[in-house]
Regions:
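Bacterial Sec-dependent N-terminal signal peptides
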Residues: 1-24
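Structured catalytic-domain cores with a bias toward divalent-metal coordination
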Residues: 19-389
Length: 389
């Protein structure tokens, strides 16, 4: 593999030296070679000097990122030295329920699946959360806990909500318009802080891994507004150096019709030159860190302003977006689903679909490429063209 990497690097130097863009690509590759390490090791390296690590999740629907997240949790160091993981997904008042699910033993796999689905039907303030990676994550975490003497505790940070207490569309509107929802980043930060303060220290330290979507993870404030993102709140609460924010590789998600590659594809091209070997690295004072951040809503920021590090795990053209949880809408649950659908859709001023249309929205398993609306092949070719043009 080292010979192939050296070959690609020579190609860059020899064939692209005349182009301004090639110099930038060479800088990115050199930076990765000099500063990076394996993603799991990178996360634990951050924990050596910081108590809280935030992973900025890419598209909520992507399943490949949870392969990495479960690898981190599966590492013996996590249960022994960290012990606590928090997620954006999941209403805070369901935290005790999810830990009962994850820390007890079930006689059969089917018994766990039944308990998991029963829990999932009440975890979120949407009629149902349809992202399959939630099943993937909770199954994986249950398996880790089942085989470990040291158990991992999961904290849920989203708004307090119970479908049992919502009877009308107006009641749902009142919830949706509440300050807790309007300022979700503040709400999730507060919920984390309350649970974090109650953690049992391990080796004299409280440590935690937080998984939240990329926009929430930002160390940023909306330009001209007094509205911090979750990452910004956490750094203010616990200290700039005590909280480390790491972004998973993704696209410039704000342009959803095109989903352009970051830095015109140079980051992905550098990853390609490294034969897509996963890596994590700090980005301060690197070409990655000096790259302007693509979302102008936060002002004139660079990547090193909004995050401490990046992880490249899977090339963009291998990401898989999956929705639908087969079997989540059982016959016994159909009536309750339609009750929620009527309330939710009326509250959102949308036409209420019949059961035959509503049910597949949540339990029909559907996967498509993470490059959507572009094809994986076209994105891969675009990236490789940057190396060989």
């Amino acid at each position: 593999m080292k010979k192939r990497i050296a070959f690609w690097f020579c190609v860059l130097c020899a064939t692209l030296s005349g182009y301004a863009q090639s110099s930038s690509l060479q800088d990115y590759v050199a930076s990765v070679r000099a500063k990076s390490c394996a993603p799991v090791d990178y996360i634990f390296k951050l924990f050596e000097h910081s108590d809280i690590v935030v992973i900025g999740e890419r598209d909520h629907r992507d399943t490949t990122q949870y392969e990495l997240i479960l690898d981190i949790l599966r590492d013996a160091r996590f249960a022994e030295e960290i012990g606590y993981v928090y997620t954006e997904v999941g209403c805070v008042n369901r935290t005790k329920d999810v830990n009962r699910l994850l820390q007890r033993k079930y006689k059969t796999a089917q018994a766990f699946s039944d308990a998991l689905y029963s829990y999932l039907r009440n975890e979120d303030f949407n009629p149902l959360w349809d992202k399959y990676n939630r099943v993937q994550f909770l199954r994986g975490l249950y398996g880790i806990n089942r085989s470990n003497r040291h158990k991992i505790t999961l904290g849920l940070t989203d708004c307090n909500f119970s479908w049992d207490k919502i009877k009308t569309a107006q009641e749902y509107r009142d919830f949706d318009d509440s300050p807790a929802c309007a300022y979700r980043d503040s709400t999730m930060s507060l919920h984390f802080a309350e649970m974090y303060a109650k953690q049992k220290p391990k080796n004299g330290k409280r440590k935690a891994l937080i998984i939240t979507n990329h926009p929430h993870a930002l160390n940023a404030t909306f330009a001209g507004k007094d509205y911090h993102r979750q990452g910004k709140w956490l750094k203010e609460l616990y200290g700039e150096d005590n909280v480390k924010i790491v972004m998973l590789n993704w696209t410039e998600y704000t342009q959803k019709e095109q989903m352009p590659l970051v830095a015109s594809g140079l980051w992905d091209a550098a990853f390609e030159v490294m034969e897509c070997q996963p890596f994590g690295m700090d980005i301060k004072e690197t070409p990655f860190g000096r790259e302007p951040y693509f979302n102008a809503r936060y002002g004139d920021l660079k990547w090193e302003d909004i995050a401490d590090g990046i992880i490249y795990y899977k090339p963009i053209y291998e990401l898989v977006l999956t929705i639908g949880i087969p079997g989540i809408v059982s016959i016994d649950f159909e009536e309750e689903l339609m009750r929620r659908i009527r309330i939710y859709f009326e509250a959102m001023d949308r036409p209420v679909p019949p059961l035959e249309e509503a049910k597949p929205m949540y339990d029909r398993f559907l996967s498509f490429p993470g490059t959507y609306p572009q094809s994986p092949h076209s994105v891969r070719d675009t990236i490789r063209h940057l190396i060989t043009e």
